[in-house]
Amino acid sequence: MSLFGKMFGSGGKGGKSASPQEAIQRLRETEEMLTKKQEFLEKKIEQELVTAKKNGTKNKRAALQALKRKKRYEKQLAQIDGTLSTIEFQREALENAHTNTEVIKNMGYAAKAMKAAHDNMDIDKVDELMQDIIEQQELAQEISDAISKPVGFGEEFDEDELLAELEELEQEELDKNLLEIGDNVPLPNVPSTSLPSRPAKKKEEEDEDDMKDLEAWAAN
């Protein structure tokens, strides 16, 4: 198949258009073919240059013919370089377009799937379901609280009466301790010796003071 056949296809106007993947693959094959053509022309140019140098002094006519062929090969090589640049640009643009198409397509699939998932959902039913869940959680908590409370098995007592009885017991214990302390503490013994008498000098001074007071009263 010719280069143009590979690039543009061999189908007629009514032929089916190629898919992006097929077009990208064809462009890559064309790039590979042109790259091989480049390598071939570069070798031919080197060969013609060697021939021209070899015959430069011996056979001028052969040298000129080699240079002419070299020029033609260089022209073809330049054309292929330009074509490769164009094909690379086209392939990259097509790959980007294909990527964007796939992304949009997948996003569309996801949107449809989400819509289908929500079609069977009613917001009122969802709210009702959540309310039921909350009520069941509250009921479960109440049951847990009831189970965790200590059970008296029918024995019920007045807590105030129990506290009053406890205070009486504490007071009785306190009084008992005080009595025990009083019985255990010994009283001081009565001194066996007489207390020292008041000094005589001091008693005489007091008597003199009394006499002075009596005389002063009589003088009045």
Curated annotation (Swiss-Prot):
It comes from the Eukaryota. Pfam families: Snf7. Keywords: Coiled coil, Cytoplasm, Endosome, Membrane, Protein transport, Transport. It is a peripheral membrane protein. It is found in: Cytoplasm, Cytosol; Late endosome membrane; Midbody. Residues 1-22, 180-220 are annotated as: Disordered. One of its GO terms (cellular component) is nuclear envelope. Disulfide bonds: none annotated. Signal peptide: none annotated. Belongs to the SNF7 family. Probable core component of the endosomal sorting required for transport complex III (ESCRT-III) which is involved in multivesicular bodies (MVBs) formation and sorting of endosomal cargo proteins into MVBs. MVBs contain intraluminal vesicles (ILVs) that are generated by invagination and scission from the limiting membrane of the endosome and mostly are delivered to lysosomes enabling degradation of membrane proteins, such as stimulated growth factor receptors, lysosomal enzymes and lipids. Probable core component of the endosomal sorting required for transport complex III (ESCRT-III). ESCRT-III components are thought to multimerize to form a flat lattice on the perimeter membrane of the endosome. This is Charged multivesicular body protein 4b. It comes from Danio rerio (Zebrafish).
